[in-house]
Amino acid sequence: MKKNLLFVFTMLCALSFFTACSDDDNSDSEVPVLLKGETAFSAEKLSLKYGDSPLLGKAITFSTEDGKTGTIKMEGVFDPSIIKDLLPSKNNVVPALAPGVIPGEVVTMFNVNLTQDGNKYTFEGTDSNNGREMKYAGTVDSTSMTLAVNVTMPKNDLLGTWNLAKQDMTTGKSPVILSWISTSPGITIPGTKDAAALLGNIFLSPMLTKYLHTVTFQEDGNIVASYSAAGKEDENSVSPVNLAQYYIKDGKLYLQLNIDMILATIAANKTKTKALDASVILQFASLLSEGIPLNCEIKDGTAAIYADKDLILPLLSLLSSEEIVELIIAQVPAGQQEMVKAIFDQLPELIKTTTEFNAGLNLEKE
């Protein structure tokens, strides 16, 4: 009997030992889920690259439940701290609108497969949607996220480098598109449309060609310009990527401006820039989320890209600012300043009675 009790006791101890070992093994094999739920990253907590260059003004929300798969949400966010030294008043209201990471996508969401590496996750892959392809790679932990995306947008007829169209006074061809028709009886300048065309051909075109050399529409949706800041032919600078992007939709070109990137560039040169620059840029905030719609006509190696009155007239109120008028008139030859000032003086009435207004660029494929 004692032997039987001893045997049973021994078996119970052995079973308890193996059960404990089994529990320990299961405990060791269950890796805790990092960042369970949603975690948002922006500003200094986010290192985002579009192509090979940093992309500012964006926010990313990362979420996972099992630590094996996750969801990433990318969108734009406007950081008011970047313009604190540029705004003329601390009471300025800063709009919270911004374009997304990928041109034409206010919000981009995609799923990722996660690999745990210590206290962080790594992920990489390809996401295709809306005719574009995005390759991505990144890491995320409890304090920060790094993400690099390389995007190839759908092919379009604007891809490549374009020069400003050459000016031809005999045919009226000009790099600048500017036509303006108003029915106002109070116009004292003969023929508003003719005056606008004259302004474009004689003043704006020569000024523009001094500063702007070429415009390149890239496969990733970036727009890059070569220019001369001093207006010298032998001086050539290239604008940074991720300042301006574009996409084509329903026959229109949508221009997206990255306000954070632009204002960061302004802030880097703020000794040369008035506070007015930032406030003017902010007037475009209502168009930032989806982009500024522009007409785009391409034929035989030429392109006409222009805004019409539906877009321009609400923005022309900016020209009522005395500071802006002074800046523009200062660039006009002294002998023509009186005529240009007369146009600005009549601007409010012109806006009310305008039936046609087109402004933009004529380009030729390089």
What are these regions (language model features)?
Residues 1-6, 10, 14-41, 137-160, ...:
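Bacterial Sec-dependent N-terminal signal peptides
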Residues 30-57, 152-203, 362-365:
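Tryptophan-anchored aromatic micro-motifs
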Residues 32-42, 67-72, 116-125, 159-161, ...:
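Short, hydrophobic/aromatic-rich segments at coil-to-beta transitions
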Residues 50-60, 102-111, 130-136, 237-242, ...:
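Amphipathic hydrophobic-ligand
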Residues 53-107, 175-267:
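N-terminal glycine/threonine-rich, aromatic-flanked beta-hairpin/loop signature
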Residues 58-66, 111-116, 137-140, 213-218, ...:
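Short, exposed beta-strand/loop patches in secreted or surface proteins that constitute
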Residues 83-97, 170-208, 256-355:
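Mixed-charge, low-complexity intrinsically disordered segments
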Residues 114-153:
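Polybasic, proline/glycine-rich intrinsically disordered low-complexity segments
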